[in-house]
Each structure stands twice: as structure tokens, then as C-alpha cells.
Amino acid sequence: MKCPKCNSTQSKVVDSRHADELNAIRRRRECENCGTRFTTFEHIEVSQLIVVKKDGTREQFSREKILNGLVRSCEKRPVRYQQLEDITNKVEWQLRDEGHTEVSSRDIGEHVMNLLMHVDQVSYVRFASVYKEFKDVDQLLASMQGILSENKRSDA
């Protein structure tokens, strides 16, 4: 690590701790040349996922897009932001664990819906109505019937 003051590469770690919110290791360092203290973060390097959209175009995976969609579908619902972060993290890691470099937007939506259904069913219907592009009330009702059947099976 280069010192930000003198550019020396000689430094020692004086403190190290886990930075949960960043999924990283935070290290406090001291330059052995000039004595300046500075902070570095160590992150896991992950490969980029490419999303293949419905129209065939490709773009880099964006967890912010997933999170924004979840926030919109959960507006005025009793869902904590941390729950949405957790869903987003789980979806990202599930996709990476599958080992593909490209993933369809359809697969991403399915992962999100599977997790969101267990957090808040109204938010699930909101998300599904946009994701599945419901054309009429019948499609919406069919989705809700699926939730009701799932509830009856889990209650039995």
C-alpha cells in the first residue's frame, strides 16, 4: 500500500476489523517512512455478471436496479430497508454461485420474486405485476390465487 502523503510502500497495519456494512476488512495503517496514518479496505474481487435483457441487449449487472425495484414495490408496506438489502444480496450471490457470466433478466426477476414472497405478499404482487407485465386484472388475480394456494399448502 502506498502512503497517500509520501508514496512510500513501507507501512504496517496497526488495527484491523471487519466492516460489516461493506463486506470488507478495514485496516488502519501507519507509514514507516513519514508516520502518516491512513485507512484501507480489503474487498473480495468478484467477476462481473452480464444481464441479457428481454430484447437481447446486454448490460452490466446492477444491484441498485434490483434494490430500487424492491423499494418501489414495498412503498408504504411494513418492510425494513435491511430486508430489501438482504434480498438483493441473496439474489446477487445466488446468481454468482450458479457460475454463469451471463444471466437473463427473467432469471433475476424469478430469484427476487421467490425471496420477496416470503417477506411481504402484497409487495410480491406489486413486483410481479411489473415484472410479469400483467395485461389485465385476470392475470393479477391468477397470481394472487397462486399465493393463496401456497399459503394453504404451508398452513396444512
UniProtKB/Swiss-Prot annotation:
Q: In terms of domain of life, where is this protein from?
A: Bacteria
Co-factor binding details = Binds 1 zinc ion.
Q: Where are the zinc fingers (unnamed)?
A: 3-34
The alphabetized UniProt keywords are:
ATP-binding, DNA-binding, Metal-binding, Nucleotide-binding, Repressor, Transcription, Transcription regulation, Zinc, Zinc-finger
Pfam families named among the record's database cross-references: ATP-cone (PF03477), Zn_ribbon_NrdR (PF22811)
GO biological process terms, semicolon-separated: negative regulation of DNA-templated transcription
Question: What's a Gene Ontology MF term here?
Answer: double-stranded DNA binding
What region holds the ATP-cone domain? 49-139
Q: Does the keyword ATP-binding apply?
A: yes
Give the InterPro entries listed for this entry. ATP-cone_dom, NrdR-like_N, RNR_NrdR-like
List, separated by semicolons, the cofactors it needs. Zn(2+)
What stretch or stretches form a coiled coil here? none
Q: What does this protein do?
A: Negatively regulates transcription of bacterial ribonucleotide reductase nrd genes and operons by binding to NrdR-boxes.
Q: Which family does it belong to?
A: Belongs to the NrdR family.
What is the designated name of this protein?
Transcriptional repressor NrdR
Species this chain originates from: Staphylococcus aureus (strain NCTC 8325 / PS 47)
Q: Which gene encodes it?
A: nrdR
